[in-house]
Amino acid sequence: MNRGFSRKSHTFLPKIFFRKMSSSGTKDKPELQFPFLQDEDTVATLQECKTLFILRGLPGSGKSTLARVIVDKYRDGTKMVSADAYKITPGARGAFSEEYKRLDEDLAAYCRRRDIRILVLDDTNHERERLEQLFEMADQYQYQVVLVEPKTAWRLGCAQLKEKNQWQLSADDLKKLKPGLEKDFLPLYFGWFLTKKSSETLRKAGQVFLEELGNHKAFKKELRQFIPGDEPREKMDLVTYFGKRPPGVLHCTTKFCDYGKAPGAEEYAQQDVLKKSYSKAFTLTISALFVTPKTTGARVELSEQQLQLWPSDVDKLSPTDNLPRGSRAHITLGCAADVEAVQTGLDLLEILRQEKGGSRGEEVGELSRGKLYSLGNGRWMLTLAKNMEVRAIFTGYYGKGKPVPTQGSRKGGALQSCTII
């Protein structure tokens, strides 16, 4: 008879005892070496985010074990949705359309609950079409996505999985599922995604900057850069002008991948540093806020560690440019009508190229957070007296980057439709 510890026989022991006991067991297991399980800073940061962990893998590869470890690690505010609970046999989804409908309804219901921060979906998730449905749901409820595949030694070995899977699938059955899981699923882009709290802090700082700039006498003299034609105007509302704003949490893009179709995407995704950093928490430093007639954003100063995740070919406007690596690092805070978010980084490079050429612009005064510089042509830079630090998770954005109806609310009212930028 096993006389080891159990919750039932040791009800007097606090819950935290079992949490520590179970988490300490993950330290020595290679298959559980993920930042979201091992790195305490990441664990703490994820508590401030809405995250959908989508597990992928062949039956018997260790997904369910991994899912339970995640739930056990985060406990409060965490829910697991498992295809097994809906009696879904791994394979083509067509035969289980009603079961998947119920699963998705339950998943969406959890997404709507304010008390749930972390959702874990346990299924094979081997079909692109199915993943795209899940990414759309994540967009709709403003959840960041982390794709997780087991690291067990047998995860792709059909002969071993035949013995391990609970569905008694044959090796041939497993081989049919394998092609969709052998290759990494690349996002639209990789980047650092800010926590909700950090996003709100930075949004507020950006809004105050726009309000102060719009009321500044030096800016009022340059209104023609923002107002078409000869329309007379004494002042303008920059918050409204930059009305095309990112929904949900803010982010700093590292590499645009276009789901693997962009040049260099596959090579970038295969880097060891990326694999080790995926789903890990970072602290980003913001040194300045800027405005141009097209965009407004925050300049990010990357650390040596963060620069390892920065592509080597994105800091140039022309082949002859020689700006330091990481120059383009930024967070888009808003765009003018009909302007795409990619323009924010280009605007920042223009400003930095001008600075490198010896023209830092004219200091025109002090705002609440630092010194204001006029750079000409409607470009303004607020150099922060004290750098801002924001917490973020490094992951991918897997959605379509198109307007989606969003659920949930924030101060100021519900967001009805947003464009992911």
UniProtKB/Swiss-Prot annotation:
InterPro entries in alphabetical order: CNPase, CNPase_cat, Cyclic_Pdiesterase, P-loop_NTPase
Active-site residues per Swiss-Prot or TrEMBL entry: H251, H330
Residues that, per the record, bind substrate: T253, T332
Chain positions with Phosphotyrosine modification: Y110
Protein name, entry field: 2',3'-cyclic-nucleotide 3'-phosphodiesterase
Any Pfam family: AAA_33
Residues anchoring lipid (S-farnesyl cysteine): C418
Gene from which the chain derives: CNP
Keyword check for Transmembrane: no
Subcellular location per the Swiss-Prot or TrEMBL entry: Membrane; Melanosome
Entry's family note: Belongs to the 2H phosphoesterase superfamily. CNPase family.
Residues carrying Cysteine methyl ester: C418
Lineage, broadest ranks: Eukaryota, Metazoa, Chordata, Craniata, Vertebrata
Source organism superkingdom: Eukaryota
